[in-house]
């Protein structure tokens, strides 16, 4: 972006200066539409989400058969919702300010199969593609027991096809594991941020890992180009895929069921706040869409991004979406939160969700390290740095009077609030890597 254009943009959008200075900030969205109007602009419906849920149910017998870790939930890929009262108390002490309401952790960090939120969207899109191919070939019917897919004849059939994806790590891991299990040939195009252990894991499964010295955007673009050369190759597009988005959206309906089981009330007097780490936007965008369908006006969805990679905040705040990257304003897009190291947000998610997401904030890497150490110490839960990004959200909410006034959130309502921090990854991190994460804050 030319200097002149940037200067003009900064006059119009003064918060850009704060982002350029790598300062932590919170921006609540003044462009929220009434719920039904905003949902209509997404271009997808509750019926689409229910169909995605039904497809996952069809695959459950197969998943339970080939992934023993899913058997306890009968092939359902779902995570626990746990109250983290000790963490809440520790945060209150650390911040010298009581965190009001009840704090919960959604442990997508420990989802079966691939140990991250990407086990939702990534695995779902691979399954949807496999189902389509098998049905078109006359090998599968919707009413079949899908455990039949665990046969050499199906693996041989799928081996004619290739699946490709560009990733900073976790999406590649989810898609690689699932595709390889079904028998597909797989290529994962990985950015410079991707952790070595993730590449090693994929290669051990026979996945073709293509490495780039550049960031996420380049890995996706190169992956897309390579896939175009092969008519038997299906490219999973993290930036634009509605199928991925729907795989994530199922989480909203599932969380509502968990709330009912735990008798957690959500209504006008008992607001729900959900804090989601955001990279390119597909995961948090899809989950938020599902949450808005499930809980309506009473759920507030807030995205958290690293100070070095606030691509969604920048895109939505300026209205430029994928037409602007963090590099355009001079940021380096280098962060310890490798899953969030994205310079340019998804235009599809930004535009679809801009009237639904309630707020966006940024967080320093050092704060992420402190938070994962504190979570480990207080709750004995281990997550990777990016997964802790949502943990500061409740403070931004309760200390921003304009936000509270806009949503008519009284002190009494906040007392009855439920805060859910969506932990997005870390379940598969090798113990020695996790130890490095946990000791980082002590050594600095």
UniProtKB/Swiss-Prot annotation:
Keywords: Lyase, Pyridoxal phosphate. Its cofactor is pyridoxal 5'-phosphate. GO terms for molecular function: D-serine ammonia-lyase activity; hydro-lyase activity; pyridoxal phosphate binding. Gene3D superfamilies: 3.40.50.1100. The modification N6-(pyridoxal phosphate)lysine is found at residue 118. Its EC number is 4.3.1.18. The keyword Lyase applies. The keyword Lyase applies. CDD domains: D-Ser-dehyd (cd06447). GO terms for biological process: D-serine catabolic process; isoleucine biosynthetic process. InterPro entries: D_Ser_am_lyase, Ser/Thr_Dehydratase, Ser/Thr_deHydtase_PyrdxlP-BS, TrpB-like_PALP, TrpB-like_PALP_sf. It catalyses: D-serine = pyruvate + NH4(+). PROSITE patterns: DEHYDRATASE_SER_THR. It comes from the Bacteria. Belongs to the serine/threonine dehydratase family. DsdA subfamily. This is Probable D-serine dehydratase. It comes from Acinetobacter baumannii (strain ATCC 17978 / DSM 105126 / CIP 53.77 / LMG 1025 / NCDC KC755 / 5377).
């Amino acid at each position: 972006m030319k200097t002149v254009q940037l200067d003009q943009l900064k006059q119009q959008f003064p918060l850009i200066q704060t982002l350029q200075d790598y300062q932590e900030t919170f921006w609540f969205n003044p462009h929220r539409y009434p719920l039904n109007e905003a949902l209509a602009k997404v271009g997808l419906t509750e019926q689409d989400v229910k169909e995605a849920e039904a497809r996952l149910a069809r695959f459950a017998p197969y998943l339970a058969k080939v992934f023993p870790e899913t058997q306890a939930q009968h092939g359902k890929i779902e995570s626990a919702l746990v109250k983290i009262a000790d963490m809440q108390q520790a945060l209150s002490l650390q911040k010298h300010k009581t965190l009001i309401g009840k704090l919960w952790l959604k442990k997508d960090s420990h989802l079966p199969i691939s140990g991250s939120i990407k086990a939702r969207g990534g695995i779902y899109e691979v399954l949807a593609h496999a189902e389509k191919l098998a049905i078109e070939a006359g090998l599968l019917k919707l009413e079949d027991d899908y455990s039949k897919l665990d046969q050499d004849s199906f693996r041989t059939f799928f081996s004619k096809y290739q699946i490709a994806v560009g990733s900073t790590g976790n999406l590649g891991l989810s898609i690689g594991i699932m595709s390889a299990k079904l028998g597909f040939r797989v290529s994962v195009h990985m950015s410079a941020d991707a952790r070595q252990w993730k590449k090693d894991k994929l290669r051990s499964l026979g996945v073709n890992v293509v490495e780039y010295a550049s960031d996420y955007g380049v890995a996706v673009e190169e992956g897309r180009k390579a896939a175009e050369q092969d008519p038997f190759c299906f490219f999973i597009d993290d930036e634009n895929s509605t199928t991925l988005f729907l795989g994530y959206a199922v989480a909203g309906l599932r969380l509502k069921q968990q709330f009912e089981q735990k008798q957690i009330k959500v209504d006008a007097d008992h607001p729900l706040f959900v804090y989601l780490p955001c990279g390119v936007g597909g995961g948090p965008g899809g989950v938020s869409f599902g949450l808005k369908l499930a809980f309506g006006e009473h759920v507030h969805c807030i995205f958290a991004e690293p100070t070095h990679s606030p691509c969604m905040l920048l895109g939505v705040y300026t209205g430029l979406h994928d037409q602007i990257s963090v590099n355009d304003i001079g940021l380096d897009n280098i962060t310890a939160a490798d899953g969030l190291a994205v310079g340019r947000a998804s235009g599809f998610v930004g535009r679809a969700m801009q009237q639904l997401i309630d707020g966006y904030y940024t967080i320093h890497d050092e704060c992420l390290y402190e938070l994962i150490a504190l979570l480990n110490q207080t709750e004995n839960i281990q997550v990777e740095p990016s997964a802790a990004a949502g943990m500061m959200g409740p403070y931004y909410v309760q200390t921003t009077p304009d936000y509270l006034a806009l949503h008519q959130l009284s002190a009494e309502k906040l007392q009855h609030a439920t805060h859910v921090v969506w932990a997005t990854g870390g379940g598969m991190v090798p113990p020695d890597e996790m130890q490095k994460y946990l000791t980082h804050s002590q050594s600095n």
